[in-house]
Structures are given as C-alpha cells and as structure tokens.
C-alpha cells in the first residue's frame, strides 16, 4: 500500500473518549490505515511510553504513525511522521532536524495550503469540514471550502472535523485522499465495529 493510500482512513486519539493504546489497537483491527497520537495535556514521559506502544501496533498492522506537534516525541518513538498546525514548529525546521519524517500540515484556506506546500509538507489536513466537539476553536470550512482546497492542492488532502458515518460519503466525494476521524471511532462503544463500518464506506470511494 502506498503512502497516499495509507492516508485514506486516519484515526486520531483523544483521551476524553478512550485510552490511546486501546483505541488505536481496536481501530487498527477495524481497518484504520493511519494513526495520530494527540495528547495535548500529557507530560513528555507519558507521551513517549504511550507512543512506543502505538509504534509497535502500527508496525504490526502496517499502518502509518504520526505524532501531533511534538518533534521530540516523534523522534523518540520513531514515528513515521509528525502533524503540525500553522502556529507550531515550522515545516522547514522539521525538515532540517528530521528529514526522514513525513510531514502533515493543517490548512484552513488557500494561503495556508500554499505556505505548507512551499515549505515542503507531504500531505494536508484540511478542515474543520463540520463543527466538532473535539476542537471547539476550530474554524468551520464546509464542503465547498474542502472541495476548493482539494482541487487546488498538489498534495494529498485528508479531510478532518466532525466526520462520521452519516456524512463521510459526501466528504469523500470532494476529491480527498482520506478522512481523519476522532469521536466517530475512538468515542464509539464498539471501536472495531465502528472502524469496520467506516472502512467499508471509504473503500467504495477511495
């Protein structure tokens, strides 16, 4: 499976819903092809310990593993890549320090997309497509905005924000390479079942 193909079903952790290691293992069993560790309020030691366990799982299931924001953690756990926002460490600095890492960059508009592309990002996380409870300060993009950025970008686009089983079909029809999901998967009562159901829908369009 190519790098781009592995972006199609991208699951992001959230402790508010479930333990990171447990939710990742369940999501991978259900067909997730990429995982991002996001632990905003945890200390470095805990992030490394959790990250190392997730690294083993993603290798076992041949899935991509990204760390949110923290370059030091990404290097410590030997993740495949890192995902950064517009206000985080610059892409150019990451490439200077850790050229081996795949770099994902968040983008809300064409200007942010062009900055990420020019600095050398490998894929874009575009959104928030819909209102979302996992990031209350997220800017709302909508399907038209997603479609515009997807059509303009030279990079693989992963849609994010409020995506669930009911609306994922219309998101996938916007020309994206994948979808990033949080609560619809890690917040589900049965994560494996929820992931399998999502994966079945994604496979019809990507």
Swiss-Prot record:
Pathway: Cofactor biosynthesis; thiamine diphosphate biosynthesis; thiamine phosphate from 4-amino-2-methyl-5-diphosphomethylpyrimidine and 4-methyl-5-(2-phosphoethyl)-thiazole: step 1/1. CDD domains: TMP_TenI. Mg(2+) binds at residues 69, 88. Keywords: Magnesium, Metal-binding, Thiamine biosynthesis, Transferase. The keyword Transmembrane does not apply. GO terms for cellular component: cytoplasm. GO terms for molecular function: magnesium ion binding; thiamine-phosphate diphosphorylase activity. SUPFAM superfamilies: Thiamin phosphate synthase. Its cofactor is Mg(2+). It catalyses: 2-[(2R,5Z)-2-carboxy-4-methylthiazol-5(2H)-ylidene]ethyl phosphate + 4-amino-2-methyl-5-(diphosphooxymethyl)pyrimidine + 2 H(+) = thiamine phosphate + CO2 + diphosphate; 2-(2-carboxy-4-methylthiazol-5-yl)ethyl phosphate + 4-amino-2-methyl-5-(diphosphooxymethyl)pyrimidine + 2 H(+) = thiamine phosphate + CO2 + diphosphate; 4-methyl-5-(2-phosphooxyethyl)-thiazole + 4-amino-2-methyl-5-(diphosphooxymethyl)pyrimidine + H(+) = thiamine phosphate + diphosphate. InterPro entries: Aldolase_TIM, ThiamineP_synth_sf, ThiamineP_synth_TenI, TMP_synthase. Signal peptide: none annotated. HAMAP family: TMP_synthase (MF_00097). This is Thiamine-phosphate synthase. The lineage of its organism: Archaea, Methanobacteriati, Methanobacteriota, Methanomada group, Methanococci. The gene is thiE.
